[in-house]
Amino acid sequence: MTVITEEQLGNPAIYQYLLKLVGEEGLELLRRWSDVSYARRWVEEKLSSEDLKAADKARFLAESRRSDEDLVEAERSDEEIAELTGINLNSVRHTLYNLYEHRLAEYRRIKNNETGWLTYLWLMRMDHMNMVLRNEMEVAAGKLAGRLRYDEANDFYQCKNCGITTTFNNAMTTNFSCPQCGTMLVHFDDELIITALKKRLAKMQTALDNA
């Protein structure tokens, strides 16, 4: 399915990733957009409207006959998503753009030949979630590996007074004096940091191998 599932929301890694990406309101938007009861209620309200045009009535009659899965996975404009979910339009747009930037939503543009107006029809792509998480983890693992190489390739010196840590080469340029306070720099043993980095990188690599 392209919409979000309860199984995905119950996955701690997916939940935390989405929470960081779109926030609590964005998560609520995803829940409601994926909940067929919201879609059914919205369609019923549209059909009961006395101001509904004939063309729109035909469209919503067709919508009412859709299966639950087809109804929640249908393309919607941002205005329709706001109506359907009851969430502020600006918040809907902000969430959609964030999802789009991370390949978790996509849109299709249609043009009104009479007015020239463009309408963007949006579709959730939560079926991309595993791929997105894997890519994010690969990027994070790459950065971590780079940090590990840097730490292993350098000796470090630290100022006990203000906490500045610098490399051996940089410390030589200041005659092993702190560039801020002048205190003599002392050798900093980063073996514990290197060990922690190796363990974290190994865990990430195991997770990637099993993804």
From Swiss-Prot:
DNA-binding recorded as keyword: yes
GO molecular function: DNA binding
UniProt superkingdom: Archaea
Gene3D superfamilies tied to this protein: Winged helix-like DNA-binding domain superfamily/Winged helix DNA-binding domain
InterPro entries per UniProt: TF_E_archaea, TFE, TFIIE/TFIIEa_HTH, TFIIE_asu, TFIIEa/SarR/Rpc3_HTH_dom, WH-like_DNA-bd_sf, WH_DNA-bd_sf, Znf_TFIIB
Chain ranges of the HTH TFE/IIEalpha-type domain: 10-130
Cysteines paired by S-S bonds: none
GO terms, biological process: regulation of DNA-templated transcription; transcription initiation at RNA polymerase II promoter
Membrane is among the record's keywords: no
Key words of the record: DNA-binding, Transcription, Transcription regulation
Record's function text: Transcription factor that plays a role in the activation of archaeal genes transcribed by RNA polymerase. Facilitates transcription initiation by enhancing TATA-box recognition by TATA-box-binding protein (Tbp), and transcription factor B (Tfb) and RNA polymerase recruitment. Not absolutely required for transcription in vitro, but particularly important in cases where Tbp or Tfb function is not optimal. It dynamically alters the nucleic acid-binding properties of RNA polymerases by stabilizing the initiation complex and destabilizing elongation complexes.
Oligomer and partners: Monomer. Interaction with RNA polymerase subunits RpoF and RpoE is necessary for Tfe stimulatory transcription activity. Able to interact with Tbp and RNA polymerase in the absence of DNA promoter. Interacts both with the preinitiation and elongation complexes.
Family: Belongs to the TFE family.
PANTHER family: GENERAL TRANSCRIPTION FACTOR IIE SUBUNIT 1, TRANSCRIPTION INITIATION FACTOR IIE, ALPHA SUBUNIT
HAMAP family on file: TFE_arch (MF_01909)
Domain notes: The winged helix domain is involved in binding to DNA in the preinitiation complex.
Protein name: Transcription factor E
Annotated organism of origin: Methanocorpusculum labreanum (strain ATCC 43576 / DSM 4855 / Z)
Organism lineage: Archaea, Methanobacteriati, Methanobacteriota, Stenosarchaea group, Methanomicrobia
Name of encoding gene: tfe
